[in-house]
From Swiss-Prot:
Disulfide bonds: none annotated. This is Aspartyl/glutamyl-tRNA(Asn/Gln) amidotransferase subunit C. It catalyses: L-glutamyl-tRNA(Gln) + L-glutamine + ATP + H2O = L-glutaminyl-tRNA(Gln) + L-glutamate + ADP + phosphate + H(+); L-aspartyl-tRNA(Asn) + L-glutamine + ATP + H2O = L-asparaginyl-tRNA(Asn) + L-glutamate + ADP + phosphate + 2 H(+). Pfam families: GatC (PF02686). It comes from Synechococcus sp. (strain CC9605). NCBIfam families: gatC. InterPro entries: Asp/Glu-ADT_sf_sub_c, GatC.
């Protein structure tokens, strides 16, 4: 794997819009190099026959089943409104003509 230079770290910091102090460049260069070496090791792992996944632990949906539920009678609901007009709620006007 290629060596990471200080200029590479500066470029990544600039692309990420990070204000990276000059005295930290050497530290981050070494850390980034270590990360890339680890990624190189991961690329060598034999994953033949391993199913693809998006997470380490399988997640299942725990919500209730969607089904038809009884509802209140329309007239009972409309009767609770401060104002109504036929089968609709009447609300104050909020937009000008």
């Amino acid at each position: 794997m290629s060596q990471i230079s200080s200029d590479d770290v500066r470029k990544v910091a600039q692309l990420a819009r990070l204000d990276l102090p000059e005295d930290k460049i050497a530290t981050y260069t070494g850390q980034l190099e270590s990360i890339l070496e680890y990624v190189g090791q991961l690329q060598q792992v034999d994953t033949e026959g391993v199913p693809e996944t998006t997470r380490a632990v399988e997640v299942t949906n725990v919500t209730r089943v969607d089904g038809v539920q009884p509802t209140a009678v329309r007239e009972d609901i409309l009767d609770q409104a401060p104002q109504r007009e036929g089968d609709f709620f009447r609300v104050p006007k909020i937009l000008a003509d």
